[in-house]
Regions:
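Substrate-binding pocket helix/loop in short-chain dehydrogenase/reductase
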Residues: 57-58, 65-67
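C-terminal helical subdomain
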Residues: 147, 166-249
């Protein structure tokens, strides 16, 4: 598929190269960044979208199923960001103006929970938090960082469930790529540290964890029952954690 996409870009007058290094490997991620700089004379935009699924209930999940998913998603996002960030820092220190973008891929599973995806959800939640940290750290170098939680039908999700024609249309990746393109454009220069939900029904900002009700602390566990019950009673339910509240998309 990568070769097909590159060929299509060339047919339409663009320039494209394919790199087959493993972005979940430290040296592979660096080689990819170095190749982009070498082929195009610089690096302006990094979109992290590597992912795999190894779905299984937590108590049945194997160590390899956990490790492989977390490595591809988490390290496969962190490693390219690390090497790209070092490139942009060096550019800035050399006196060059940097106006760069990083767009990461998180998931509704990571933001709102999904049974049977402990490995995937943990990795995607980590990517969301990683994106917020990176947005703060890399802003000094002229880099914006955002993340997108897409709902799209891709090679990774085909066959997981039957979809109506309307759902297929609403899961067209074109809805997602439009937002990615906008965030990567000059218009997106002031947007950083945000996590977006994106699908054919619309775009939304996923609001992060907030401080909820508070109660006085105690070193005596016997005093905590009523206090914890009170703050739970006045707290909001974790957003979207009950799948019955999700849009049927």
């Amino acid at each position: 598929p990568a070769e097909e996409v590159a060929a299509l870009i060339r047919e339409r007058g663009g320039k494209a190269v394919v790199d087959t290094h493993n972005v979940a490997e430290w040296a592979g991620a660096k080689a990819m960044v170095d190749k982009a700089v070498s082929e195009f004379g610089g690096l302006d935009i990094l979109v992290n979208n590597a992912g795999i699924l190894r779905d299984r209930m937590l108590i049945n999940m194997t160590e390899d199923e956990w490790d492989s998913v977390v490595k591809v998603h988490m390290k496969g996002t962190f490693a390219p960001m690390h090497h790209a960030g070092n490139y942009w820092r060096a550019q800035q220190k050399a006196g060059k103006k940097v106006d760069a973008r990083i767009i990461n891929t998180t998931s509704h599973s990571g933001l709102f929970c999904n049974i049977g995806q402990a490995n995937y959800a943990a990795a995607k939640a980590g990517i969301a938090s990683l994106s917020l940290v990176a947005a703060r750290e890399l802003s000094r170098y002229g880099v914006t960082v955002n993340a997108i939680a897409p709902r799209a039908e891709t090679r990774m999700t085909q066959g997981l469930r039957e979809l109506t024609p309307e759902q297929v249309e609403r899961r067209d990746p074109a809805w997602i790529s439009a937002l990615v393109t906008w965030l990567a454009s000059p218009e997106g220069a002031k947007i950083s540290g945000k996590v977006f939900e994106a699908w054919g029904y619309g775009y939304a900002v996923a609001e992060s964890w907030q401080h909820g009700p508070i109660t006085p602390a105690s070193k005596d566990p016997s005093e905590l029952g009523p206090r914890v019950e009170e703050i739970i009673r006045f707290s909001r339910k974790n957003a979207g954690i009950d799948r019955d509240t999700w849009l049927d998309i």
